[in-house]
């Protein structure tokens, strides 16, 4: 599902799509597809980690150790060499900026490719999880009906 929007754009089946910025970045920069991201009106969403309280790795502290490692400044900056998702820590941005061009191709600056870059956050919409929980079924049905009529 995540690969479909950039594929539809690259194949000329659609002229506009929404999707994960990392997929669009990979298509445009990684694969050279003739597409471009538009950040005006982007939808900003949050991601969360959840630990199972009183699980075997919670009680012995291993779950928190792994979480701390996965979300360390260095690890988050390192992941940006491969995908343009914004790191969860602002401290990671400094590492990325200091190492630009940061992308694995050695020529692409990553900070401007991220949804949280200052020039990309001038007019974003914050995802409303409650709205989607309340309306997902109805909207999905309308979406499928609209697509069937194309």
Task: Indicate where each model-derived feature is located.
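Solvent-exposed loop/turn segments at secondary-structure junctions
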Residues: 22-26, 42-44, 56-57, 74
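Mature extracytoplasmic/periplasmic domains
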Residues: 52-120
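Non-transmembrane alpha-helical segments in soluble domains
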Residues: 6, 10, 18, 64-71, ...
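Periplasmic-binding protein-like
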Residues: 32-53, 104
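Soluble non-cytosolic domains of exported or imported proteins
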Residues: 3, 57-61, 130-137
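Conserved C-terminal helix/tail region of periplasmic/extracytoplasmic solute-binding proteins
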Residues: 115-150
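Ligand-binding pocket segment of bilobal, Venus flytrap-like solute-binding proteins
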Residues: 1-38
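Sec/Tat-exported extracytoplasmic proteins
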Residues: 13, 21, 28-31, 70-74, ...
């Amino acid at each position: 599902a995540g690969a479909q929007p950039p594929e539809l754009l690259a194949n000329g089946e659609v002229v506009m799509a929404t999707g994960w910025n990392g997929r669009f970045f990979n298509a445009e920069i990684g694969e050279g597809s003739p597409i471009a991201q538009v950040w005006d009106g982007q939808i900003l969403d949050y991601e969360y980690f959840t630990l199972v309280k009183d699980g075997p790795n919670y009680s012995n502290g291993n779950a928190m150790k792994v979480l701390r490692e996965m979300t360390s400044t260095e690890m988050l900056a390192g992941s940006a060499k491969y995908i343009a998702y914004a790191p969860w820590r602002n401290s990671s941005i400094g590492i990325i900026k200091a190492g630009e061009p940061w992308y694995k191709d050695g020529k692409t600056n990553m900070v401007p490719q991220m949804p949280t870059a200052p020039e990309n956050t001038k007019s974003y919409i914050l995802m409303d999880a409650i709205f989607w929980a309340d309306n997902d079924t109805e909207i999905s049905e309308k979406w499928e009906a609209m697509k069937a009529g194309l």
